[in-house]
Every structure is written in C-alpha cells, then in structure tokens.
Amino acid sequence: MPWRPPHQRYVVLTPKEVLAFCRENDVKAVDLRFMDFIGQWAHTTVPVSKLTEATFADGVGFDGSSMRGWQRVDESDMLLIPQTENCFLDPFNKLPTLNLICNIVDPITHEDYSRDPRFIARKAVNFLSSTGVADAAYFLSLIHI
C-alpha cells in the first residue's frame, strides 16, 4: 500500500503500485495534469482502463497547438508522461479520480519539451546545483481557479 501522508497525497514509486492503488480504491478515471508555459493548469481525463504500465513509458498523446505559445499545427503532436511520485485522489470529484502530474515530451525523440515548466524547473535546479549556487530550490505553485 502506498504511503499516505495526512494531507491525502500519495507517494507511489512504480507504475504497478499506481495500478494496484487504482484497483484498491475503485478509481474510475485518471486526470493527467500538466502546465502551460505561464503556469496555467491543463488536463485530460481518461478512463482508468486506459492506464497501463506502458502508459508510464509511452505516454498519452495530445495536441500541443491548443496550448498558448507551444507548437504550430503541423508540429503539434506531444506526449504526456505521467509521473508516479505525484499521484493523489481528487478530493472534489464525485467520480473516484486519480490525478497524475505529467512531464511533456516530443513523441518522436522522447526528449523533454523545452517549454514544459517542469523541465525548465529541473534544468534550473540542476544548474544551481552544478554551479554550487544552491543545493535546494523551492517553488510556489499557484492554481488558477
């Protein structure tokens, strides 16, 4: 059973554990969440039956041209790669829904997308660490309602 802190967030380390967690908690839908370049949350929801171990490696396709400032229509295919360490049950949805925060990658090369805020943050942390400027970074996440 995944560890559950008091604030209802779950730390899950493997895709198998996520799938087991979904079965144990009768999850019906999976909300794949990501941010646009300015930090606005976006998401796509899929039935839990579409979530497999392969999803965590292969990702779920979406149209990047629908996001402000991302891709042209002729280069719009992108992939959402769910990150298991950020899953939690949605406390507000009546339908049992698991939320997964995703990284965004190129569907051909599987390289991180340069405008993904999570990738930008990872690059910043790596730079701070490699230059000795800092050994930790803290980010404030604002959710637009």
Please annotate each region the language model reported:
Residues 2-142:
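ATP/Mg2+-dependent ligation/transfer catalytic cores
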